[in-house]
Amino acid sequence: MDKSNGLRVILFPLPLQGCINPMIQLAKILHSRGFSITVIHTRFNAPKASNHPLFTFLQIPDGLSETETRTHDITLLLTLLNRSCESPFRECLTKLLQSADSETGEEKQRISCLIDDSGWIFTQPVAQSFNLPRLVLNTYKVSFFRDHFVLPQLRREMYLPLQDSEQGDDPVEEFPPLRKKDLLQILDQESEQLDSYSNMILETTKASSGLIFVSTCEELDQDSLSQAREDYQVPIFTIGPSHSYFPGSSSSLFTVDETCIPWLDKQEDKSVIYVSFGSISTIGEAEFMEIAWALRNSDQPFLWVVRGGSVVHGAEWIEQLHEKGKIVNWAPQQEVLKHQAIGGFLTHNGWNSTVESVFEGVPMICMPFVWDQLLNARFVSDVWMVGLHLEGRIERNVIEGMIRRLFSETEGKAIRERMEILKENVGRSVKPKGSAYRSLQHLIDYITYF
C-alpha cells in the first residue's frame, strides 16, 4: 500500500448487493493508493464493517419499516430511501467536515470528495452546499446508462403495443442493439414514476464533478464512451473490471457456501454449468421446475445458486436434484467463475455478473429478466457472440438444448474461441498501460488535486 497522502474520500453506496460490492472494491483500490476511506451507509443492508478494518464506517437511519425492507419493487425502495436519507446524510456529512476542519498537525486530513451511486438523487445539491466535489459511481454498462434516458421519449412515441408481432425482431435505432420486443419488456416494467426518477439521475449526474464506471472498460464500451463524453461534459473514468484489482475479495450481504469449491474440485475441467440469477431476481414455481428439469435432463453437472426466498415453492424438488449437481444458497461467484471446472454460466445478465464471466472467459446462456439485463444479453449473444440467448417462455427442452449446444464441439467450440479473444482484450485493459489501468491513474490524479 502507498503511504497515506493526507486525503480522505467519503463513499456512500446504495444498499443493494450489486452496488455495495463495486463501491467496496473501489474503496480498496483508493486505499491502496494512499487515501483514507470513510463509508457512510444505511441501516438496511449495512456492509460488514468487521471485514474491512482499515475503513471507517458510519451508519445513518434510513426510515424503512420491516415490511418495506422486504419489497421486491426496487423503484419504490429507492424512492423511500431518497426521501428518508437526505436529512441524516446531511447531518453526518456536516460532522465529518467539521471534524476534518478541527484536526491539526500530522492528524489533519483533507476530505477530497464524495463518491456515491447515481441512484442517490439528493446528494448532488447537498455536496454543492458544502462545496464538496461529488463523483458518481455507476455499475451499468456505459451504453445502457447513456441510452436509457431516452425511454420516456420512446414511451411517448407509442412503442407499446406493437402493431405487428413480426416487428418484435426489428432493431431499436435509438437504443442499439435492443430489439423492439426487448424494449417492450423494459417499458412494460417501467412506470412514469421511474421516468421521473431517471430524469433526476440525468440532471444530477450532469451537475457532478465526474462519472466513474467500475465495471467496464474501453474494450467493452468504446463507441458509447465517446458519445457519453459529448453528452455529459464531465470527466468519465472507466476503471473496470474493478474486481480484478483484488481477486477473490467480496462484500457479500449473503452468507457464502464455501462447500461448492471442494465439490468443483472433483469435477472434470470445463464440465460444469453454473446457474445464478443474482441477488434480486425471483422465479416462480413453474419456471423453477422448467429450469430444474432442463438441468436434470442435460446430463451436465451443475452448480445452482437458489437464494432463500428467491423461489416460490419448489423447495421439495431441490433435494432430488443433488444427485445431478450441487445447490447452494449463495456462492463466491468470482472464485466459482475462475474455477477450471466451470464451462458455462446460465445467468440473468446483470452487468457485474456479465463482466465477471467475460473476465474469466466463461461462455453464457442469457436469461434476462428486467431492465439493463436485456441489453447486456443482446451484447453477449448478438454483438460479441460469446453466448446463447434464451428468448420467450422458459421451457425445459429449450434450456436443455442450449446447454447441450454450449458444451458441444461445434457451436460451443466457436463460442468458446470468441470468448477467449474477448477475455484477453478485457484482461489487458487492467494491466499496466491498459485502458482501465490508465483511466484509474487519471482518476487518482483528478481527486488528489481537487
UniProtKB/Swiss-Prot annotation:
<keyword id="KW-0328">Glycosyltransferase</keyword>
<dbReference type="InterPro" id="IPR002213">
    <property type="entry name" value="UDP_glucos_trans"/>
</dbReference>
<dbReference type="Pfam" id="PF00201">
    <property type="entry name" value="UDPGT"/>
</dbReference>
<feature type="binding site">
    <location>
        <begin position="331"/>
        <end position="333"/>
    </location>
    <ligand>
        <name>UDP-alpha-D-glucose</name>
    </ligand>
</feature>
<comment type="similarity">
    <text>Belongs to the UDP-glycosyltransferase family.</text>
</comment>
<feature type="binding site">
    <location>
        <begin position="370"/>
        <end position="373"/>
    </location>
    <ligand>
        <name>UDP-alpha-D-glucose</name>
    </ligand>
</feature>
<feature type="binding site">
    <location>
        <begin position="348"/>
        <end position="356"/>
    </location>
    <ligand>
        <name>UDP-alpha-D-glucose</name>
    </ligand>
</feature>
<feature type="binding site">
    <location>
        <position position="279"/>
    </location>
    <ligand>
        <name>UDP-alpha-D-glucose</name>
    </ligand>
</feature>
<protein>
    <recommendedName>
        <fullName>UDP-glycosyltransferase 76C3</fullName>
        <ecNumber>2.4.1.-</ecNumber>
    </recommendedName>
</protein>
<keyword id="KW-0808">Transferase</keyword>
<dbReference type="GO" id="GO:0008194">
    <property type="term" value="F:UDP-glycosyltransferase activity"/>
</dbReference>
